[in-house]
Amino acid sequence: MKVAISGGGTGGHVYPALALIRELKKIHPEAEFLYIGTEKGLEAGIVKREGIPFEAIEITGFKRSLSLENIKTVMRFLSGAKKSKQILRDFKPDVVIGTGGYVCGPVVYAAAKLKIPTLIHEQNSVAGLTNKFLSRYTDKVAICFEEVSDSFASEKIVFTGNPRASEVVGVDSEGALETYGLVSGKPTVLVFGGSRGARGVNEAVEAILPEWNNRDFQLLYVTGDVHYEKIKDSLAELNLGNHISVQPFIYDMPKILNAVTLVVSRAGATTLAELTALGVPSILIPSPYVTANHQENNARALEKNNAAIVITEAELKNTDLMATVDSILNDEAKLNGMKLSAKQMGRPDAAAKLVEAVLSIMK
């Protein structure tokens, strides 16, 4: 069995692809994989570190507005599709899967033209431009949010969820909090703004740290590498208690997510898949800097189901974040209700469901 996968630009497209590969390997340990991405995207480093064969093509994304740059992008797309055809002819995959990002455009398009079975995976509640385009050519479209179903032909849709969800379920959290100087068994809030951190989230948290010093519940505050030194210096005079741990980055996030009580974070699709799979309540602060405002749409889906409270970045300055945290952690009925609602939205079997969809289209 040979599988070619393409997706990139951000971790939100790459990590689901890797989760799918791992799940396929469980069922077909003899399977061969080829990952097609760009050398400039996040995927180049991540995929190579995983030891998965990697081929690169050159492609850039389309602008949503009319632009001369889009003419160049069309030329790059055609060139990328031509190279993709050659790569696919050489590898001879049984199926080609796209997990989003502009790089999978020419790859999945080329596969469809070569009559190779194809599937695309849309992680967000708003369809990406590339997936919208590719859906005309693919055999199946796997989705994670019901809200996005109107963007694709109904006969092609299969609701699988995000395969990253499966990778956090059942992870042993023993000693996870102790690694960061905290104590197991105490109510703990995790705050993070994505892999690089988020200035808006950091500013809101810094403003309430003096108040947090007087709370009983613990805080694991992840600033992001690029913000850490500056924030560390600014907090030096606060004399924070041992129940507050400030870190630049978390490398064992699945373990930590299994150990915390509440999460304050951005609303990327992968993060939400993990939170709902575990039934972790959240306060979501969607990034306003993403295509089609898809993070807010993702977050509103959880809010609608009482699994999260949403605060937009524009609302942060006029919102008492500490009071919002208090309102959840000091109300056991509310906390448990949000846990249950999040859990009901979760798809812990997402990886298996996606594999099932992939196998269903293979000749």
Swiss-Prot record:
Keywords: Cell cycle, Cell division, Cell membrane, Cell shape, Cell wall biogenesis/degradation, Glycosyltransferase, Membrane, Peptidoglycan synthesis, Transferase. One of its GO terms (biological process) is peptidoglycan biosynthetic process. GO terms for molecular function: UDP-N-acetyl-D-glucosamine:N-acetylmuramoyl-L-alanyl-D-glutamyl-meso-2,6-diaminopimelyl-D-alanyl-D-alanine-diphosphoundecaprenol 4-beta-N-acetylglucosaminlytransferase activity; undecaprenyldiphospho-muramoylpentapeptide beta-N-acetylglucosaminyltransferase activity. It comes from the Bacteria. Gene3D superfamilies: Glycogen Phosphorylase B. Pfam families: Glyco_tran_28_C, Glyco_transf_28. GO terms for cellular component: plasma membrane. It is a peripheral membrane protein. UDP-N-acetyl-alpha-D-glucosamine binds at T10, G11, G12, N124, S195, I250, Q295. Belongs to the glycosyltransferase 28 family. MurG subfamily. Cell wall formation. Catalyzes the transfer of a GlcNAc subunit on undecaprenyl-pyrophosphoryl-MurNAc-pentapeptide (lipid intermediate I) to form undecaprenyl-pyrophosphoryl-MurNAc-(pentapeptide)GlcNAc (lipid intermediate II). This is UDP-N-acetylglucosamine--N-acetylmuramyl-(pentapeptide) pyrophosphoryl-undecaprenol N-acetylglucosamine transferase. The lineage of its organism: Bacteria, Bacillati, Bacillota, Bacilli, Bacillales.
